[in-house]
A protein has these predicted regions:
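Bacterial N-terminal signal peptides
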Residues: 7-16
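Periplasmic alpha-helical coiled-coil/stalk elements that build and connect Gram-negative outer-membrane
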Residues: 27, 146-263, 365-368, 372
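Small/polar (Gly/Ser/Thr/Ala-rich) solvent-exposed segments
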Residues: 44, 67-82, 103-109, 119-148, ...
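Amphipathic alpha-helical coiled-coil segments
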Residues: 45-60, 149, 153-172, 183, ...
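Residues on the lipid-exposed face of transmembrane beta-strands in outer-membrane beta-barrel proteins
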Residues: 116-120, 230, 321-325, 424
Length: 443
């Protein structure tokens, strides 16, 4: 008996643990956003672009440093000048090589030239410094783009999360309608059995029940699709089980339109990023103008020539300074400067347009928020009235004072009011998220 009691106790204790292990814990909105900011694939892509911009700064900085090259060159020739020079370079020139026949018709010679060359830029019109500044500006712009991508990912997560919640509300509404319609069908059948109702009234009630069941099927499919969409944004397999913890609710959003628009102009990272781009195009004008100036480089070179590969022979060094000045290039530089100035002006116009666009986005989201709140108030009252209307008409139907169609109309109106209220509540929460995105609020 003790063994049986122990087994029974073990089963009782274990069953809840097993049931809890069957599915993941409910997902809160905050957890969903945090997950998306870590695993969302488009956001990860933006992160790699940011790394590329960071590498671009290092790439630009390398222009300040010397460049070193090592080479090994093989030449076999019987050209008199080449043979003469190669013998000198190899330190292998003999007095007999001055013989006229050897000078004019020398035997072929092998020459392996090992060379180390170092080039140090001294002045190239400021290309190195301007290129470095442009890379730094591009990095700052990339940081702002990445920050904006984080905000957009958070917004998409909120929208998808509330999409799951809305689908759940639709399922709840459909089940409520199904329950009330089933009661109506049963009542209609009872009245028909008592001879108080026509068969057509019963059939009409059953048709309405079929419509409600179809609505439930669509709502369940909508929920499955919404969960797959949420999983995709979270960077998870689309068939990952999802249970959300938070429900659609109303919370007032503080701030006037004017103050919110001011926040957008001050805080939005995409505007800051575009401002960096405008500065970068200004540097582009200065970069184009550097072609008017000379290039000065210092070159150091070490050579070793021998008859064999990496063999021992004559060696030498060379130091030189090189100045190159393109005094006329067919107006190429002039047109490059014109192009750069046009790009700078275009970026400036785009920056102004982006600011106007940001103000409009705030205005639209703000108006959508106000509209959704008004719809919520209207539909909330409609739900209360619809519920009372259905109760009254159902009682009248049971007393033989109303038709089946009256009950169906009342039930349909209540279902529509419940659906509209859920949609308005969803629109309010999404509009709030859109407003936070529009003003540049960080998550």
């Amino acid at each position: 008996m003790k063994t049986i009691a122990f087994i029974a106790l073990f089963i009782i204790i274990s069953v809840p643990a097993v049931s809890l292990a069957e599915g993941p814990p409910p997902l809160t909105l905050e957890e969903a956003v945090k997950t998306a900011l870590v695993h969302n694939r488009p956001l990860l892509s933006e992160g790699e672009k940011l790394k590329a911009s960071e590498a671009g700064v290092g790439e630009a900085a390398s222009a300040f440093l010397p460049k070193a090259n090592v080479s090994e060159t093989f030449v076999r020739s019987d050209n008199p000048v080449t043979v003469f020079g190669s013998k000198l370079n190899q330190g292998n020139f003999q007095a007999s090589d001055f013989a006229i026949d050897k000078l004019n018709s020398p035997s072929p010679i092998n020459d392996f030239n090992f060379r180390v060359q170092v080039i140090q830029p001294l002045f190239n019109g400021g290309k190195e410094l301007i290129g470095y500044r442009r890379a730094k500006l591009a990095l700052e712009s990339a940081k702002m783009t990445h920050e904006r991508a984080r905000m957009e990912t958070a917004y998409e997560t909120v929208q998808a999360y509330w999409g799951v919640a809305l689908a759940g509300e639709y399922i709840k509404t459909a089940k409520q309608a199904e329950k009330s319609t089933e009661k109506h069908v049963n009542l209609a059948q009872d009245l028909y059995g008592q001879g108080m109702l026509l068969r057509s009234e019963v059939l009409l009630a059953k048709v309405h029940l079929a419509d409600v069941e179809e609505m439930l099927i669509k709502a369940e499919n909508r929920e499955a699709t919404a969960k797959a969409a949420l999983n995709m944004i979270l960077g998870r397999p689309q068939d990952t089980p999802v249970t959300i913890a938070d429900s659609l609710a109303y919370a007032p959003f503080p701030g006037s339109l004017e103050s919110l628009q001011g926040e957008a102009l001050k805080d939005r990272p995409d505007l800051k990023g575009m401002k960096y781009n405008v500065e970068n195009t200004g540097e582009g004008v200065r970069m184009a103008q550097t072609d008017y100036l000379p290039d000065i480089n210092l070159i150091g070179q070490y050579d070793r020539d021998s008859r064999d590969f990496f063999g021992h022979g004559g060696d030498s060094y060379t130091l030189m300074g090189r100045l190159t000045w393109n005094v006329f290039d067919g107006f190429l530089t002039t047109n490059k400067v014109r192009e750069a100035r046009a790009n700078r002006n275009a970026a400036s116009y785009m920056y102004d347009q982006m600011k106007e666009g940001a103000l409009f986005e705030v205005r639209k989201a703000y108006n959508d928020l106000q509209e959704a709140k008004k719809r919520m108030d209207v539909e909330s009252a409609a739900v209360k009235e619809g519920r009372e209307s259905l109760r009254i008409i159902t009682e009248r139907f049971g007393a033989g004072m109303a038709k089946s169609l009256d009950v169906i109309d009342a039930d349909t109106a209540l279902t529509r009011a419940r659906t509209n209220y859920a949609a308005a509540l969803y629109d309010y929460n999404v509009a709030e998220a859109a407003l936070r995105l529009a003003i540049g609020e960080k998550y």
